[in-house]
Curated annotation (Swiss-Prot):
Feature: compositional bias, Low complexity: 185-201, 237-260, 419-431
Domain Ubiquitin-like residue range list: 31-105
Keyword NAD attributed: no
GO CC terms: cytoplasm; cytosol; nucleolus; nucleus
Species, as recorded: Homo sapiens (Human)
Keywords: Cytoplasm, Nucleus
Compositional bias (Pro residues): 202-213
Single Gene Ontology MF annotation: kinase binding
Protein name, per record: Midnolin
Annotated gene: MIDN
């Protein structure tokens, strides 16, 4: 007897009664489930026969973009808590009811942020995680911290671009020369000579802190798409690109400061810009923890690596040397510029030799003057003043709207409702003058034809009776 079409059932020769048994293709066939929500929506899912309840909730969480802790599944009035689906009698074509869970009461404030981060990361697909860690696409997360909602967008630097790598090395050498550190700037001056016009070093202003030419999107820690980095950028050595994690460190500022070779795992904020109250952006760089790296030194493709990057970024210390100046700082630089600026830093340069030839004494003097002109406390006070000003303006707007609504209600309840034609005629008659006192008539807002008071007396009665 030949096997039946489709290969779902296979029969053996010599079996009594031509008995057939299920083949491996039928055993591994996925089962189809119909998920019905309480709002009337239906979802069809194909899951393996040995799927667990936790795996099914994770699939629904990724599809609906809802944390799996907020999903509850029912099968014939039985809640699926844990274990395999077959243990609850779920088979091919079964109908499951999706019920959202409602939280009531108080929650632990200490466990909220971590749960929120994990819920946001668990809803990511493997493609999103891989694209983010390789620098192909940004990662956008919506996090809840206490009673506030926070949107975070991260972008790691792209890899495998030697020309852009030279640009980062030249920028690192420029920053090292601006700080007057010859031990770091001298070994990088030789590989920085063949910089092409496409990767030309940006013009360095007279102030020692170079400005960042790369655009930074508001509200996101995103590096510029044209800038790349690798861990050797921290050491200013252009060799061996696989010694540390390439996707963990990002930068988009040419003022990124080189760090020593024995750098501890963690992140450093290179630049930080406050665009508006509650809206920030900047760049960061760092080294991944060894537990998040594979044998070749590359970051592991899982959500644990992203969680480690987020934790390092939250615990990172502010790094002011690579911070792009704001408008207030640029005004302060113009006022507090040194008396004898370095002439070698004014024109556009394409090699590192001119940068290393700059005298370091005037640069250090300019740094001290800028720090005296713009202490860190003033920036914090400006942020607080801006936030207070926004709150006051919002309160004034709310009060103005409240006054307008109150006036509209008062006008609607008024005793006199004059038509526009009568008002126009009244204004014309009052302006033309004539008779007694037109100002009083216009002030009272009455017509000349209408009397102020009409006696409720029968007009047939004689006047003598009225007087008496």
């Amino acid at each position: 007897m030949e096997p039946q079409p489709g290969g779902a059932r296979s029969c053996r020769r010599g079996a009594p009664g031509g008995a057939c048994e299920l083949g491996p293709a039928a055993e591994a066939a996925p089962m189809s489930l119909a998920i019905h929500s309480t709002t009337g929506t239906r979802y069809d899912l194909a899951v393996p026969p040995d799927e667990t309840v936790e795996g099914l909730r994770k699939r629904l969480s990724q599809r609906l973009k809802v944390p799996k802790e907020r999903l509850a599944l029912l099968h014939k009035d039985t809640r699926l808590s844990s274990g395999k689906l077959q243990e609850f009698g779920v088979g091919d074509g079964s109908k499951l009811t999706l019920v959202p869970t409602v939280e009531a009461g108080l929650m632990s404030q200490a466990s909220r942020p971590e749960q929120s981060v994990m819920q946001a990361l668990e809803s990511l697909t493997e493609t999103q995680v891989s694209d983010f860690l390789s620098g192909r696409s940004p990662l956008t997360l919506a996090l809840r911290v206490g009673d506030h909602m926070m949107f975070v967008q991260l972008q790691l630097a792209a890899q495998h671009a030697p020309l852009q790598h030279r640009h980062v090395l030249a920028a690192a050498a420029a920053a090292a020369a601006a700080r007057g550190d010859p031990s770091i700037a001298s070994p990088v001056s030789s590989p920085c000579r063949p910089v092409s016009s496409a990767a030309r070093v940006p013009p360095v202003p007279t102030s020692p802190s170079p400005a960042s030419p790369s655009p930074i999107t508001a509200g996101s820690f995103r590096s510029h798409a044209a800038s790349t980095t690798c861990p050797e950028q921290m050491d200013c050595s252009p060799t061996a690109s696989s010694s540390a994690s390439p996707g963990a460190s990002t930068t988009s500022t040419p003022g990124a400061s080189p760090a020593p070779r024995s750098r501890k795992p963690g992140a450093v904020i290179e630049s930080f810009v406050n665009h508006a109250p509650g809206v920030f952006s900047g760049t960061f760089s760092g080294t991944l923890h060894p537990n998040c790296q594979d044998s070749s030194g590359r970051p592991r493709r899982d959500i644990g690596t992203i969680l480690q990057i987020l934790n390092d970024l939250l615990s990172a210390t502010r790094h002011y040397q690579g911070m792009p100046p704001s408008l207030a700082q640029l005004r302060c630089h113009a006022q507090c510029s040194p008396a004898s600026p370095a002439p070698d830093l004014a024109p556009r340069t394409t090699s590192c030799e001119k940068l290393t030839a700059a005298p370091s004494a005037s640069l250090l003097q300019g740094q001290s003057q800028i720090r005296m002109c713009k202490p860190p406390g003033d920036r914090l006070r400006q942020t607080e003043n801006r936030a207070t000003r926004c709150k006051v303006e919002r309160l004034q707007l709310l009060l103005q709207q409240k006054r307008l609504r109150r006036k509209a209600r008062r006008d609607a309840r008024g005793p006199y409702h004059w038509s526009p034609s009568r008002k126009a005629g009244r204004s014309d008659s009052s302006s033309s003058g004539g008779g007694g006192s037109p100002s009083e008539a216009s002030g009272l807002g009455l017509d000349f034809e209408d009397s102020v008071w009409k006696p409720e007396v029968n007009p047939d009665i004689k006047s003598e009776f009225v007087v008496a």
